[in-house]
Amino acid sequence: MGCGLRKLEDPDDSSPGKIFSTLKRPQVETKTEFAYEYVLLDFTLQASSNPEVIKINSILDIVTKVENYYLKGYIVGAIHPVIQPVGQRKHLPASYLYRVVLLRLKLSPKNSAAPSGQRRPRLVIEECPLTSEAQTNDAAKELIEKINVAAKRGMKFVGFISQHYSPSKFCNGTNHDGDIESMLHVRHGSDENCRSWNEGTLSGQSSESGIEEELHHESGQYQMEQNGSPTSSKSRKGEASDNKLYTVFNAFDDDSTSWAYQEGILSMKVTRKGSVISTLDADWLELTTFYYKQGLSLIDSFVFWETSKGEHLPKSLEGFFIYEEEGSGVPGSSRKGNDAIVVEQWTVIEGCEIKTDYGPLLHTLAEFGWLLTSVLPTPVLRHDSEGNLATKQIVFLQRPVMWNSAAQTPDKKASRHIKGEDKNKATSRSIGLDTTSSQPAESRHLPEECRLSPSRECWTKEGRLAQHNSFSGFSSSDNVLRELDDGQFDQEDGVTQVTCM
């Protein structure tokens, strides 16, 4: 499952993401009894000039901000930071951005009545104390126990979300709260900063390398002065209390329906530049298909990103997926298994505004009954030619099995079918700057058969697709899947599907 590594100088190395699925394309595009409607809301803990990014003072404020959506039948399906705030990434402006995905059932013409017994929940966010020293396997079991206890009271688990408290209040402006902040903040539109952050690109290195080197150098210098120890990913003395972990639930007034949660293996290979993670790799379907076949839903993930001061930097990261056993009254819960789609998506951020993300694909797949259940943000970063930040996110979607598609086994590898001269070119499954190209994803043209992600400004808050002259986008979200070459999904039964975006 996956592809080999392309050469650094490959001009066609432009994929902004990849899709992995247990189904072939015609099956992915088959409409089901139910479809979904999604609303994507962005929140920030800092001031933002963009009125569409909602300012909050705490994660807890999200509850009141989404109340009106709950009255309209939406619920929070996923919540995540835009980037994984690990180490010095906690000081980047984008680390204060959060995404909330709301969803509701959209009835198809086949079924014009709402499912019976459907209840309206309320959003609950509770603090879940967890220090960095407590991030062990024992702590993982403790977290699972906590959400299982809550589930017995009618609390349906949505996910964990952390908040790093910082004195900084500025998005892309001048920071007055310390040298480390001012060194790491980048002013949007500054040619000088864009040049400095893209020196790696101009010198033949990836723009991601430039980020890692700058973060590594600046944060290392600062920590050497403060701690006498360079680039420790552990928080400085006294900072542990500045990180809070929250648990998010959809709470029902009665406990007639309960859910059970269990953990599953999550292991990723990583490469680093210094102590900073630059790429990571995982066999997503191999890790998850077994659980999907059992009818479980992947709800969230928990990764031990940090390493303590003085510890050996591992070449792999461990964590766990959290799976849910569906309770009664859940549409499709009577089915014996789930099919899955996993998307490796580059999300582009301009200042405190998300410019390119998984939104268009999500809205397209929603029409075919695909439910987004979890988004795993990563600390893997790069910059585009305009100086905008890009981060890799892993998006998990599922749908109840409609046929014997779950007969696939998680140990089977997926193959990739490509036409033309790209047929013999391999692409990396690495989640970092796997293409290691010197050009940003949104400024290069994709091969016809690899188009899945629209332009950098393709999805507006009104749900419209727009074009951008530096990227091959799409005229409408309905065309996203149709742009895929049929050959990419034309594989023998029982093999997981892979395509590039």
UniProtKB/Swiss-Prot annotation:
Source organism per UniProt: Homo sapiens (Human)
* Annotated region described as Disordered, given as residue ranges: 1-20, 196-239, 407-449
| Lipidation positions, renumbered (N-myristoyl glycine) | G2
Q: Where is the lipid attached (S-palmitoyl cysteine)?
A: C3
Q: Which gene encodes it?
A: RFTN2
Q: Which family is it part of? A: Belongs to the raftlin family.
Source organism phylogeny: Eukaryota, Metazoa, Chordata, Craniata, Vertebrata
Q: Where do Basic and acidic residues bias regions lie?
A: 410-425
BP terms from Gene Ontology:
dsRNA transport; response to exogenous dsRNA
Topology within the bilayer: Lipid-anchor
Residues that bear Phosphothreonine: T409
Q: Which GO terms describe its cellular component?
A: plasma membrane
User: What is this protein's name?
Assistant: Raftlin-2
Polar residues bias spans: 220-233, 427-441
Q: Which domain of life is it from?
A: Eukaryota
Cellular location(s): Cell membrane
Sum up the protein's function in the record's words: Upon bacterial lipopolysaccharide stimulation, mediates clathrin-dependent internalization of TLR4 in dendritic cells, resulting in activation of TICAM1-mediated signaling and subsequent IFNB1 production. May regulate B-cell antigen receptor-mediated signaling.
Keyword Membrane found: yes
Where mainly located? membrane
Keywords in UniProt for this one?
Answer: Cell membrane, Lipoprotein, Membrane, Myristate, Palmitate, Phosphoprotein
Q: Phosphoserine-modified residues are where?
A: S405, S430
InterPro entries attached here? Raftlin
